[in-house]
């Protein structure tokens, strides 16, 4: 683990290829060897999964979590590879499966739980592209976890820069717009979690709700509405929704 991190965060992480040629990765990271031997016949790519991975590692800052993420972001591509009738390769489901594989690899290499969790979440979501609207971006940040930002943007850019030039400008423009919307959301301090709602479980009980799992369900419903329309996040408006629900239930 120590030697791998030292190599990945060095000025020359591409030296991993030397370790591959010497047969060293076959011992501690055999999954990397499989990536080196997996082609990507696809307009978005111009080299093997392994070569793409090496370029992606070099395209992120020399941070342990970011470089481990780029090392493992496409780890499941060999297992997920399918080829269509035209001879084009596809890798459906590789981010989710890759996240599971990354967890196993990082545990095997005895990384700490915090590093494992952060890397696996970034691997899981590296290909997620929400629609460029305020509500879609708020929902994405809520779903992915605010702590994965802004690292996720570095991951997405490195992935694009390590691909072929096909639609590169368009892909990078998308990430720029996504990041801009995320930053606006943070500047406005928009509510993204239950903790940031203007009401708490205690407020719902005080408004007449019975304690129990329905409190959690109601808070989730309120958050869903606030992600749609941040202007609703005032105590007055949220309690109005709650009391409306209570009177509806009492009527029925």
Task: Provide a role label for each language-model segment.
Residues 1-71, 75-93, 97-111, 129, ...:
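Glycine- and charge-enriched loop/helix tracts that form the active or gating conduit
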Residues 7-31, 144-169:
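Structured, non-catalytic alpha/beta "coupling" segments that mediate domain-domain communication
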Residues 10-14, 51, 97, 114, ...:
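Generic recognition of short, well-ordered alpha-helical interface segments
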Residues 32, 140, 199:
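Short clusters of hydrophobic/aromatic residues that line enzyme substrate/ligand-binding pockets
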Residues 40-50, 54-58, 111-168:
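Histidine/acidic-rich helix-loop-helix segments that form or flank divalent-metal centers
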Residues 65-66, 151, 192:
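Alpha-helical hydrophobic/aromatic positions enriched in membrane-embedded helices and signal peptides
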Residues 99-103, 120, 201:
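An amphipathic alpha-helix signature
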Residues 104-108, 163-252:
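Charged substrate- and nucleic-acid-binding regions of tRNA-handling and nucleotidyl-transfer enzymes
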């Amino acid at each position: 683990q120590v030697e791998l991190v030292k190599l990945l965060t060095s000025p020359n992480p591409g030296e991993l290829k030397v370790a591959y040629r010497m047969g060293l990765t076959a011992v501690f990271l055999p999954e990397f060897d499989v990536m080196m031997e997996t082609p990507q016949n696809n307009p978005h790519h111009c080299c093997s999964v392994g070569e793409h991975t090496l370029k992606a590692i070099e395209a992120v800052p020399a941070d342990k979590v970011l470089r481990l993420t780029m090392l493992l972001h496409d780890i499941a591509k060999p297992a997920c590879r399918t080829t269509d009738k035209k001879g084009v390769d596809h890798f459906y489901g590789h981010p989710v499966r890759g996240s599971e594989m990354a967890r196993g690899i990082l545990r095997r290499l005895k990384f700490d739980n915090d590093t494992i969790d952060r890397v696996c979440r970034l691997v899981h979501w590296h290909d997620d592209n929400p629609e460029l609207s305020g509500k879609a971006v708020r929902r994405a940040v809520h779903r992915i976890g605010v702590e994965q930002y802004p690292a996720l943007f570095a991951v997405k850019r490195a992935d694009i820069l390590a691909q072929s030039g096909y639609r590169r400008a368009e892909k990078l423009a998308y990430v720029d717009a996504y990041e801009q919307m995320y930053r606006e959301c943070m500047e406005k301090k928009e509510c993204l979690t239950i903790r940031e709602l203007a009401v708490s479980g205690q407020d719902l009980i005080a408004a007449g709700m019975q304690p129990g799992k329905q409190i959690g369900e109601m808070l989730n419903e309120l958050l869903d509405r606030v992600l749609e329309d941040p202007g609703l996040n005032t105590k007055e408006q949220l309690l109005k929704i709650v009391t409306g629900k209570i009177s509806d239930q009492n009527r029925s």
